[in-house]
């Protein structure tokens, strides 16, 4: 990336989540040797933790929160580019958008939200329509490679800007959530 006047910093915080004991085994060995853990992987992708590894929730609560605190302290009002793996990107999305467990589960199960290789998320505090800057991130735009079926070439698909708002519950909303449990 030839970004003018860029200052790059390498950090272990952006590493892929730890896959623990299953890091070096095949998927078939995982299914055979960790059958119960394999079952949980598919039913609870947010809190599922590989044996001796990290869940996406662990990554969000520990590394992503620390990363955002550090960026706030060191990079105020600067543009920041981060390059990382998909699960850390999911943890970043979970944290920045303050997703509920239910919304995270919906996205994890949806092809529309799948993070493929070379997917880019662009978060912004600047309203793309008005240029007005807000205190917190409120917009996200995704770019991802897709295969053009007509000519077999890869192209970059850039989604429209999407505004997100952190959920705030009224008293009645909170009562409804409690009753739903």
Residue ranges of predicted features:
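Conserved anionic group-binding/transfer micro-motifs
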Residues: 30, 59-60
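Non-catalytic terminal regions with compositionally biased, polar/charged low complexity
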Residues: 126, 132-181
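Phosphate-coordination/substrate-recognition cap region in phosphate-metabolizing enzymes
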Residues: 1-39, 109-119, 180
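Active-site catalytic microenvironments for nucleophilic, acid-base chemistry
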Residues: 1-3, 95-99
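Generic structural signal for well-ordered alpha-helical scaffold segments
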Residues: 60, 64-72
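Short glycine/proline- and acidic residue-enriched helix-loop micro-motifs
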Residues: 37-58, 163-166
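Generic beta-sheet signal
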Residues: 76-87
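Domain-level recognition of soluble alpha/beta enzyme cores
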Residues: 100-131
